[in-house]
Swiss-Prot record:
The gene is SCD5. This is Stearoyl-CoA desaturase 5. Fe cation 1 binds at residues 94, 99, 131, 135, 275. GO terms for cellular component: endoplasmic reticulum membrane. Fe cation 2 binds at residues 134, 243, 272, 276.
Length: 330
């Protein structure tokens, strides 16, 4: 588990628990025109999200013309920020907080929470709760980004509409006590907006300008806007492409696939058939030489003594499952 429940009373932020519980219902409201959802439900379009995401992607396209004019250090910095933000999602919100596939000591949890704010993909609590719903109710109406509704919906469209009522109702029934018990999760949620402004936009922009004299214009569009847009789309490919394209050597009866190209961009998160078959496995991929920087990072943290109790599917368990339900592709 991410953190001991006994820590909950040691910090003056207990009211954050109530804010989190209130957040469970925050996606229900909203007005605006409606569109058909799954099984005929009408879902309100969130026009603010449509406009902001459209502007973000237009900004990213414009950023491409600035690349030849930027200093090489700025491009390296943007890539470093991409990797840092990615770890906040993959090693943090996903493998640590959503699946509890390993334990992390307080310094590592703080680092991952800060990195997660740089990713700006919802706070740890909401991300983890929705991801647990995605696994428990995969590709049903209770799945926040149900791939059965098509590539566009599972990639980005799910962010353009209010959550399906099944996502809200089933989400309330999930056990999230471990998330509520972790002060790092509560504090990050309480101060999420300011942490996102600082970590996703201010810090990535100011470092190139202040340290090696990059223009603020180039710094903002390359290290913030372009980097953030690429980061979002690579993460979304796990929800879309990795549920549609690839083989299924572990379970042919589920939609998630092995997609090495997604794994390459998402630092190890594309071995999705394996992950949905063995969600408790901290590596999210089978033994071997798979490209999985997130696993390498967790292993390094264990070597430093900052992470422990890595959970792993055994080789006999994996082979037995492949023989029973795999598609014989591996």
């Amino acid at each position: 588990m991410p953190g001991p429940a006994t820590d909950a009373g040691k910090i003056p932020f207990c009211d954050a628990k109530e804010e989190i519980r209130a957040g469970l219902e925050s996606s229900e409201g909203g007005g605006g025109p409606e569109r058909p959802g799954a099984r005929g439900q009408r879902q309100n379009i969130v026009w603010r999200n449509v406009v902001l995401m459209s502007l973000l992607h237009l900004g990213a396209v414009y950023s491409l013309v600035l690349i030849p004019k930027a200093k090489p250090l700025t491009l390296l910095w943007a890539y470093f920020c991409f990797l840092l933000a990615a770890l906040g999602v993959t090693a943090g919100a996903h493998r640590l907080w959503s699946h509890r596939s390993y334990r992390a000591k307080l310094p590592l949890r703080i680092f991952l929470a800060v990195a997660n704010s740089m990713a700006f993909q919802n706070d740890i609590f909401e991300w983890s709760r929705d991801h647990r719903a995605h696994h428990k109710y995969s590709e049903t109406d209770a799945d926040p980004h149900n791939a059965r509704r098509g590539f566009f919906f599972s990639h980005i469209g799910w962010l353009f509409v209010r959550k399906h009522r099944d996502v809200i109702e089933k989400g309330r029934k999930l056990d999230v006590t471990d998330l509520l018990a972790d002060p790092v999760v509560r504090i990050q949620r309480k101060y999420y907006k300011i942490s996102v402004v600082l970590m996703c936009f201010v810090v990535p922009t100011l470092v190139p300008w202040y340290i090696w004299g990059e223009s603020l214009w180039n710094s903002y569009f390359l290290a913030s806007i372009l980097r953030y847009t690429i980061s979002l789309n690579i993460s979304w490919l796990v929800n879309s492409a990795a549920h549609m394209y690839g083989n299924r050597p572990y379970d042919k009866h589920i939609s998630p696939r092995q997609n090495p190209l997604v794994a390459l961009g998402a630092i190890g998160e594309g071995f999705h058939n394996y992950h949905h078959t063995f969600p408790f496995d901290y590596s999210a991929s089978e033994f071997g030489l798979n490209f999985n920087p997130t696993t390498w990072f967790i292993d390094f943290m264990c070597w430093l003594g900052l992470a422990t109790d890595r959970k792993r599917a055994t080789k006999p368990m994996i082979e037995a499952r492949k023989a029973r339900t795999g598609d014989s592709s591996a």
